[in-house]
Amino acid sequence: SNRPMPLNTYQFKNMIQCTVPKRSWWDFADYGCYCGRGGSGTPIDDLDRCCQVHDNCYNSAREQGGCRPKQKTYSYECKAGTLSCSGSNNSCAATVCDCDRLAAICFAGAPYNDNNYNIDLKARCQ
């Protein structure tokens, strides 16, 4: 689909490029049961588990009134592959920034299995 990317998704993409510079962020946009389009079943590996944790983090951020993680912009820095969230973020922005920061760090530490890209969600993510 050619929907414009929500602003925060753009920031999350940049965070991923900070911690995993050798890979395209697209590699993470459709991976396993939780990265990108999915959101059900048992995560199929460590990287997929990173995305499940990120989904859960966004869900708990939504419980703060009026906090919409996919639209929320925040202030952060990437220095030499290290991410930090700015102290000037309001509570929603701080929460969402930390969700994204922890996921990007998790991605950097998890092996990438090409066989788990663009899997059949119906068959494998019940």
Curated annotation (Swiss-Prot):
It comes from Naja sagittifera. Belongs to the phospholipase A2 family. Group I subfamily. D49 sub-subfamily. It comes from the Eukaryota. One of its GO terms (biological process) is lipid catabolic process. Its EC number is 3.1.1.4. Disulfide bonds join C18-C78, C33-C125, C35-C51, C50-C106, C57-C99, C67-C92, C85-C97. SUPFAM superfamilies: Phospholipase A2, PLA2. Heterodimer formed between two homologous isoforms: isoform 1 and isoform 2. The active site is at H54, D100. Its main location: secreted. PROSITE patterns: PA2_ASP, PA2_HIS. Signal peptide: none annotated. Residues 1-7 form a propeptide. The keyword Endoplasmic reticulum does not apply. CDD domains: PLA2c. GO terms for molecular function: calcium ion binding; calcium-dependent phospholipase A2 activity; phospholipid binding. Its cofactor is Ca(2+). PLA2 catalyzes the calcium-dependent hydrolysis of the 2-acyl groups in 3-sn-phosphoglycerides. The keyword Calcium applies. This is Basic phospholipase A2 1.
